[in-house]
């Protein structure tokens, strides 16, 4: 079965203001949690790989999972930190968390470029790279009147999102 690694900041933790003071300050992306649950239920090995302290991530996830369980009476999954000496994560049904590069088949990351074997494309991709957050609309410069007017139009790619 495949092993799937997830980055934490920008993928699971929304991370809208960057690193800041190192705290985990933002909301969890609930759709990614449900994706992880789906993978775990379907016998994929899944772990989070981050430069953050894995205990910090585990505490954040445990707090969210307790709230979810209280509100829905459903347990999503358990979370376990694994040590730097462990290179493989293969505990079925449990989300692993580590701060080192462990072995994986697929990586889900908001700051990665897929290498397609053509080294000539890499430099251009690096120079032009933007995270998905950079494509989101910045509403900070809009006035209240703008939000209430008919002038506000979403870019085409967002028009059919619900």
Put a short name on every predicted segment.
Residues 1-162:
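HAD-like aspartate-dependent phosphatase fold
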């Amino acid at each position: 079965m495949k092993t799937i690694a997830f980055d934490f900041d920008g993928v699971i933790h929304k991370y809208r203001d960057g690193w800041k003071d190192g705290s985990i300050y933002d909301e969890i992306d609930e759709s990614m949690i449900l994706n992880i649950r789906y993978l775990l239920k379907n016998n994929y090995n899944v772990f989070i790989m981050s430069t953050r302290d894995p205990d910090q991530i585990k505490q954040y996830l445990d707090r969210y999972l307790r709230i979810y369980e209280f509100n829905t009476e459903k347990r999503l999954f358990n979370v376990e930190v694994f040590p730097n000496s462990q290179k493989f994560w293969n505990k079925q049904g449990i989300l692993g968390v580590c701060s080192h590069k462990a072995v994986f088949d697929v990586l889900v990351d908001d700051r990665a470029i897929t290498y397609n074997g053509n080294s000539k494309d890499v430099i251009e991709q690096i120079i032009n790279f933007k995270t998905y957050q950079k494509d989101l609309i910045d509403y900070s410069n809009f006035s209240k009147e703008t939000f209430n007017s008919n002038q506000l139009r979403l870019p085409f790619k967002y028009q059919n999102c619900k």
